[in-house]
Curated annotation (Swiss-Prot):
Keywords: Repeat, Signal. Transmembrane segments: none annotated. Residues 84-124 are annotated as: Right arm (Gly- and Cys-rich tandem repeats). It comes from the Eukaryota. This protein is one of many from the eggshell of the silk moth. This is Chorion class high-cysteine HCA protein 12. Belongs to the chorion protein family. It comes from Bombyx mori (Silk moth). The keyword Zinc does not apply. Residues 1-21 form the signal peptide. Residues 22-35 are annotated as: Left arm. The lineage of its organism: Eukaryota, Metazoa, Ecdysozoa, Arthropoda, Hexapoda. Residues 36-83 are annotated as: Central domain.
Length: 124
């Protein structure tokens, strides 16, 4: 039992070093080259609950999301944002055909950006 507890403690220490290494630029080694300096994920990432993000988040590639995505407040995006599924809570799929006026970007332009709001939303 003691061996298992010691192993679990070591694993937790490695996880803490990885987290602090990505935030601070160095791990517990204090800049001596012993820390983790970021990384790239490969595989599945599951998030249950809230995922607060402050600042800028750059995502290159695809992020598949199975389930619902809810935004509270502004969700600003530069570049192209494609949302497949339902863009708004009315169930129309973001096409604006239900009369709710969501049109994909919230201003009723249909997501084409022709209204001058500067936001584009491609809903498929």
């Amino acid at each position: 039992m003691f061996t298992f507890a010691l192993l679990l403690l070591c694993v937790q220490g490695c996880l803490i070093q990885n987290v602090y290494g990505q935030c601070c630029g160095c791990g517990c080694g204090g800049g001596c080259g012993c820390g983790c300096y970021g990384g790239e994920g490969d595989g599945n990432v599951n998030v249950c609950g809230e995922l607060p993000v402050c600042g800028e988040t750059l995502v290159c590639g695809r992020v598949p999301i199975c389930g619902g995505v809810c935004f509270k407040g502004p969700a600003c995006a530069s570049g192209c944002v494609s949302i497949c599924g339902r863009c708004c809570g009315c169930g129309c799929g973001g096409c604006g055909g239900c009369g709710c006026g969501c049109g994909g970007c919230g201003c009723g332009c249909g997501g084409c950006g022709g209204c001058g709001c500067g936001r584009r939303c491609c809903c498929c």
